């Protein structure tokens, strides 16, 4: 039988040799994690971009059929470097895995619908570190424009934060996707709303950068009457942009993606703000 003294010596040895070092390591790891997080936020605040936005291990893959759809249907994906294409494919796969796709009015959801919609969301958030949208868990797809019992109007698309859903008329989504230079793209517009709303409700690094950029954009416009007048007079942005701040950003986003050269040429400061908000440094942007 071990004596009390020997037991105490054994316990003290156990504490000093194992428990204390483990405790120090745990505290050290926690402190290091907090310091890294503080550094990342400081870096983002100063340079207006995340320290890093992409992961380089354990990347998901699409099925062969889904990959062919992505490659054939999405010009933005084709213009990326091979390294960025791997990241893009991973994020499209994650969107499909983590969101529920629901066909309405007996619509059968296909891989084309899943990949094309997921690729639009991925494109817009590709510069984000935290790219998954908390306010979207369900993608509802109607065959065409649908009637809303709430406001008694036909809709082509909407974001419903209460239901954590984004809704599309597939006919109109596809039409906007197929014509890439008319600045009318339902998918970009509605995901623009989702990104804007998501950033307003979060404090991650990408949301911080987005919100700072949007505040900079609105301050710039409020303090430059001539720019506001030029915006309206140019008719480059459709009139719907001036409905409210959310529609303004969503319309600007359509133009930013579909006609970036013209956007940059006509309104370079706005273009710079948009590019910074999205951390968009890909393809020809």
What are these regions (language model features)?
Residues 1-134, 200-220, 271-285:
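N-terminal low-structure segments adjacent to metalloprotease catalytic domains
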Residues 2-10, 116-128, 146-156, 160-162, ...:
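Metalloprotease/metallohydrolase-associated module, dominated by Zn2+-dependent proteases
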Residues 19, 76, 80, 105, ...:
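Conserved aromatic-histidine-acidic binding/catalytic patches
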Residues 28, 180-184, 246:
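Hydrophobic (often cysteine-bearing) scaffold residues that line and stabilize catalytic clefts
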Residues 81, 182-199, 250:
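Active-site recognition of the HExxH zinc-binding catalytic motif
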Residues 134-146, 151:
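Short, His- and charge-rich active-site/binding loops that engage polyanionic ligands
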Residues 137-138, 164-166, 184:
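Generic beta-strand structural signal
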